[in-house]
Curated annotation (Swiss-Prot):
HAMAP family: IspG. InterPro entries: Dihydropteroate_synth-like_sf, IspG_bac, IspG_bac-typ, NO2/SO3_Rdtase_4Fe4S_sf. Keywords: 4Fe-4S, Iron, Iron-sulfur, Isoprene biosynthesis, Metal-binding, Oxidoreductase. The keyword Mitochondrion does not apply. Binds 1 [4Fe-4S] cluster. Its cofactor is [4Fe-4S] cluster. The gene is ispG. It catalyses: (2E)-4-hydroxy-3-methylbut-2-enyl diphosphate + oxidized [flavodoxin] + H2O + 2 H(+) = 2-C-methyl-D-erythritol 2,4-cyclic diphosphate + reduced [flavodoxin]. It comes from Pseudomonas aeruginosa (strain ATCC 15692 / DSM 22644 / CIP 104116 / JCM 14847 / LMG 12228 / 1C / PRS 101 / PAO1). This is 4-hydroxy-3-methylbut-2-en-1-yl diphosphate synthase (flavodoxin). Pfam families: GcpE.
Amino acid sequence: MSIHSASPIIRRKSRKIWVGNVPVGGDAPIAVQSMTNTETCDVAATVAQIRRLEDAGADIVRVSVPDMDAAEAFGKIKQQVNVPLVADIHFDYRIALRVAELGVDCLRINPGNIGREDRVKAVVDAARERNIPIRIGVNAGSLEKDLQKKYGEPTPEALLESAMRHVDHLDKLDFQNFKVSVKASDVFMAVAAYRLLARQIEQPLHLGITEAGGLRSGTVKSAVGLGMLLAEGIGDTIRISLAADPVEEIKVGFDILKSLHLRSRGINFIACPSCSRQNFDVVKTMNELEGRLEDLLVPMDVAVIGCVVNGPGEAKEAHVGLTGGTPNLVYIDGKPSQKLTNDNLVDELERLIRQKAAEKAEADASLIARG
């Protein structure tokens, strides 16, 4: 099944909300988001990072707003970027009220630490007045004290109870413009909690494995946990939490969605791990191609196979395929196109991929124009 094949996954039906100009839930594509790790009060640095995230394809960006100074900085940041911004609020509900005045696109509050119900009501009233959605963000590391006492330790049931407590509160306030997350650093706990929650409510679900780890370990945990849920049709937005450059979170997020045929963006590489049969350096070729072609957004399959054992079969299924041989053979749309030697192999392959991407983009645009 290639990247342009339809996904067999039947997604959970959920209510559609809007985060700025981005639809979330319903029949909307699964949104990929990240979070800045700059000092929010450093407006220039935060804006620069958000723009990098936009360039990487981020649909939504979350920004931590720990105090009133950060709230004022948030307002300045909002004026300088195009992507919808979520304000991450903890402890002081008045910060949420201020960023609502400054044009925030979504408010993320943690029910375990935002305070009394009257404070939650004040935030809801401000959100309702300005049509701002709220994300109820439940986290295993910050459950309410009474739930910690009741369950003794974080459990899927504790996460669900925390979430439903605040869902019920919003229901009583007749506020339905919200999404929910129930995150944990343990994959099985998070997956179980999301499964329970998905059966209870119709609101969109924001998926994440919190504090997943560094680039490698966090990618693996997130791919396993989110992959399980997404394959079951659960999830409307995702965030890959990595102790790394936030841009990597966007890349990994799209790679997970591409692997499940839930969303297509950029090149889907098919490459062999290489062995002594290879007729060119597959690893070096792949590393160079991935770096050079990061800017391409057109959904494409590109196969890079080092020998003739699996090469022709994989290459014929790709938009552009390279099979190792003497000389190497390039396939375009499944048909043999030209032979390449190892001299300037990457340069020529990049040229052919970009040429095919331009043709495909033009054809896709023409198809859309015809309706």
